[in-house]
Each structure stands twice: as structure tokens, then as C-alpha cells.
Amino acid sequence: MSAYEYPRLSRSDIITALKDAQIASVTETDLKTPTSDFVSELYTRILIYLDALDEEEKGQVDFEALEQLENPDHHATSMQAMKLYCKVKDMLEMLDCPLPISFKDLLRPESSRTEFFISALLNYGLYKDSKMDLIRPKAEELGLLDEQRKQCEAKVAQLNAEIGEFDEAVERDLPFVQELEANIEQLNKKILELNNQQMSLRATFQKMREKSTQMDNEISKAEFDLVETVQENANLRSQIVQSPDKLQGALEEKKLVLGETKKAEQSAMVTFQEKAAILEVFEKALKKILKSSSQLQLINEQVTNAKTVEKEFKALKDKLSEDGVAYKSLEAKVVERERIVEQLNESLKQLEKEKAVMFDDWTKQLNELKVEVESRRRELETRQTNVESVVAMVDDNTAKTNQVRQSGEAKVKKLAAKYEEIVKQFHEYTVSFDAFLPSL
């Protein structure tokens, strides 16, 4: 027995179940006195509801099997009925239905047996719907996870593309960066040298400024001494008349002092000009240093931009690693859902194998039934031949005596009735036999 049971539903329950499932709209009269057409249509709709029969297969017949018959047009309806019977029988056998169905249940259905078979199929449908309701959230969740996996894969692909572009940009700019780093190193060395030179020049400039200040003081002092000398010279001129000899000596002494003062003044002027030239050189060097400093500032800005790009690249790598972790967790969930789907597929394959085994058993029984029908058909042919010979004998004996004729006519009528019954049975067996041929 399967996981579900076969409680016989009442007619009202069957009507309600068929209506709720939108299979068919039936009445109690239809179930109380079922007809062959009603039962065939109801079984067809139930099989379509259970996915055991496609909507397109409804009313179709096996034309290849019909071509093997002498009059295929006479067997189209019987072929459809036999095909439906095989489908219903396979389904009930798959459900381990305790009550076997026969072809008679389609041709001349009984109310109790029909209700039992419909109850079994509807119970299976309810059982299947309940299981599908349990599986449906998992399937929807699996679909959402698959969609999220696709989105993550697209996002990872986009990030990989961006990383590839960044890697290409890094490789493309690597020679320039290396050259820039070399230039920066050279400029740093040059800046260090210029800073040292600037410190040295500042110290020298400070010394020269102090020396210039000292020379200015000396020049001022020399000018002051010159003024005093001029005043003394004027005094000496006024005193020449009074003491020329003494004045001449003092004058010569003053001339010597004045000569030394002029020499000191000339020397101070030369030193001042040299200091001015050195100061001009310092100013030019300072301008060059300022220009180099501006270039260095631009280079530092480029280096800062390169470092910013590198930080962004590292941030993208970290983000990619986080997305990779999320993707791995999502992939683990997808693997788990795929494992569940594989288990369901394995269960479905097992059911299909069991169905194939049942179908083989049914085919074997059908072959045996075919042999039996063939033997009965031959027996009926023999009987028909015998009947024809008897009729001929009766016709011959009719001319002899009226009594024999009357008894012969009665016997012929009796044999004719029996013959019609035999022909009718023969026709039913022929229809059944022809209906089994497509599945061979």
C-alpha cells in the first residue's frame, strides 16, 4: 500500500472534490447511473488533472496500429476506449488500488465500482496536492536563490571586469609610475642637496650681510673721519701762516691717513660689488629652487592621486572578497537545494521504473489474452462452418416431409438465434482483440 489510503468518498464528497479541483461538474444522478461516455470523459479529465494524460493526447489514436487492421475506421472508437482503459489501469496499479479495474468498467460501468475508482484517483490527487503544497515553498525559494545566484554571478562578473580594467590600467601606467618614482627619488635627492645648499647660502649670505653692515659702518666712520679731516685741513690752512713747518708735517701725516682711508674705501666698494654679485646669484638660485619646489608639488599631487587610486583598488578588492564570501554561502545554499531536487528526481525515476515493470507485466498478460482471443476466434469460425452445414441439411430435408420441415424450421430458428449470439460474442472479442494490437 502507498502512503495514502482508499476511503470510499460519498457522492457529495466526490461532486465537491471534482468541483473544487475544477475537473468536472457532475450530479448525483450521473454517479448513480453512470454511462460509458460519462465515465470515459470523467476518467479523461481526472487523468489530465493528475498529469497522467496530456490535453493534446485527448481523443488521439495510434494511426500506425490502425493501419495494421483491415478496417481501421471501424476500430477508431474502440482504440480510444482501450487507450483510456490502459491509462486508467496503469494509474490504479501504480497506486496499488486493491480493486482491479476491467474493460467492462468503461463499457458497462457500475455505480459502486465507478465511485470506488474515482475515490482512489481523487484521494491520490488530494495526496499529490498536499505534497506539492509542501514542496512549492522550497521550489519557490530555490527559484529565488537561483535568481540571486545569477545576480551575484553577474555582479561578480562586473566586478571582475572592473578589476581587470584596473589591472590593465595599473599595468599600463606601471612604467610611468616607475619612471615617476625614479624622478621623485632624484628630485628628493636634488631637493635635499638644494636645501643643504640653501642653508649654506643662507649662512654665507648672513655672514656677508654682517660683513656688509660692518663695511657700511666702516664707510660711515671713514666719511666721518674725512669730514673731520676736511675740518682739520681747513684749520691747518688757517694755521699755515702761523707755523708752516709744523703744519707741513701734520699735512703730510693727514695725507697718509687720507690715502689709507681712500684705499680702505676702494677696498670696501670692491667687496660691496662682489657681495652684490653673490646676492644676485643667490636670488637666481632662489628662483630656481622655487620653480623646482612648484614642480615637486605637482609631482607630489600626482603621487597622491596614484596613492588614492591604489586605495580605491584595494577597497574594490576587499569588497570583491566580501562579495566572494557571500557568493560562496549562496552557492552552498544552491547546492543544498540542488541536492533536494536530485533526491526528488531520483524518487521520480524510481516511480517510473516501477511503472515500467508494471507495464511489462500488463503487456505479458495482454499477450496471453491475445492468444486466448485468437483461439476463441478460430473456434467461432469452426462453429460458424458447422452452423452453415446444418442449415444446408435442414434445407435438404424440408422437401421430404412437412413434419421434418416444421421441426427443421424450429431448429433453424433456434440455431439462427444461437448463431446471432455467437456472432455478437465474436464481434465483441474481435473488438477487444483489435484494441489490444496497438500496444504490442
From Swiss-Prot:
The organism's superkingdom is given as Eukaryota
Which segment of the chain is annotated as a signal peptide? none
Spell out the coiled coil positions from the record: 142-239, 299-386
Single annotated GO MF = microtubule binding
Q: Which UniProt keywords apply?
A: Cell cycle, Cell division, Centromere, Chromosome, Coiled coil, Mitosis
Describe the disruption phenotype: Embryonic lethality due to division arrest before the globular stage.
Q: Where in the cell is it found?
A: Chromosome, Centromere
Per the record's keyword annotation, is Cell cycle included, yes or no?
Answer: yes
Gene Ontology CC annotations of this record:
kinetochore microtubule; Ndc80 complex; plant-type vacuole; plasma membrane
Q: What is its main location?
A: nucleus
Q: Can you cite a GO biological process for this protein?
A: mitotic sister chromatid segregation
Assembly notes: Component of the NDC80 complex, which consists of NDC80, NUF2, SPC24 and SPC25.
What is stated as this protein's family in its record?
Answer: Belongs to the NUF2 family.
Function noted in UniProt: Acts as a component of the essential kinetochore-associated NDC80 complex, which is required for chromosome segregation and spindle checkpoint activity to ensure proper cell division.
What name appears for this protein in its UniProt entry? Kinetochore protein NUF2 homolog
Species assigned in the record: Arabidopsis thaliana
Q: What is the lineage of its organism?
A: Eukaryota, Viridiplantae, Streptophyta, Embryophyta, Tracheophyta
